[in-house]
Amino acid sequence: MATELSLSVQYGVADARLPRWRLRRWVQYALAGAAGDGHAGLAGAELGLRLVGLAEGRRLNREFRGRDYATNVLTFEYGTGPDGVARGDIVVCVPVLAREAREQRKTLLDHAAHLTVHGTLHALGYDHIKAGEARRMEALETAVLARMGIADPYLAA
């Protein structure tokens, strides 16, 4: 995991299960996975990661995506500069994350790891709008999570 990482973690809501060190570790795994998937020239990443509640999650989703509900993860990709450093912000709505984990019969930590990896990959330019892009991104997420000992998040529980 050689890619340099500057990660700013902000807590709009606190959750003792999601300390900075754990979030940082998940982001580092995602960066390592991306480096092995064609992002070898990535010199580093400067990312913000904010954990929010329902009201803030809903406001941000409405303001930036025109959708009036809180979503699980929002990513703002700012691109990779000439210095090879990718920049972006990731917002995880903790109540949505917790609800989805229960509904999907996953542990909160496994689902939080998945959403953190997913958001990090978006910050690096991955997307899932087109079918081919979605397959590539989901395969990479699955591989990264497997390295962490987490089951394929796309298999039905």
From Swiss-Prot:
Molecular function GO labels: metalloendopeptidase activity; RNA endonuclease activity; zinc ion binding
Localization annotation: Cytoplasm
Family under the similarity heading: Belongs to the endoribonuclease YbeY family.
Protein residues bound to Zn(2+): 118, 122, 128
Record's GO cellular component terms: cytoplasm
Main location: cytoplasm
UniProt keyword terms in alphabetical order: Cytoplasm, Endonuclease, Hydrolase, Metal-binding, Nuclease, Ribosome biogenesis, rRNA processing, Zinc
Cofactor binding comment, as recorded: Binds 1 zinc ion.
InterPro entries: MetalPrtase_cat_dom_sf_prd, YbeY, YbeY_CS
Cofactor annotation: Zn(2+)
E.C. numbers: 3.1.-.-
Protein name as annotated: Endoribonuclease YbeY
Gene name of the encoded protein: ybeY
Protein role: Single strand-specific metallo-endoribonuclease involved in late-stage 70S ribosome quality control and in maturation of the 3' terminus of the 16S rRNA.
Matches recorded under HAMAP family: Endoribonucl_YbeY
Gene Ontology biological process terms, A to Z: rRNA processing
Any Pfam family matching the protein: YbeY
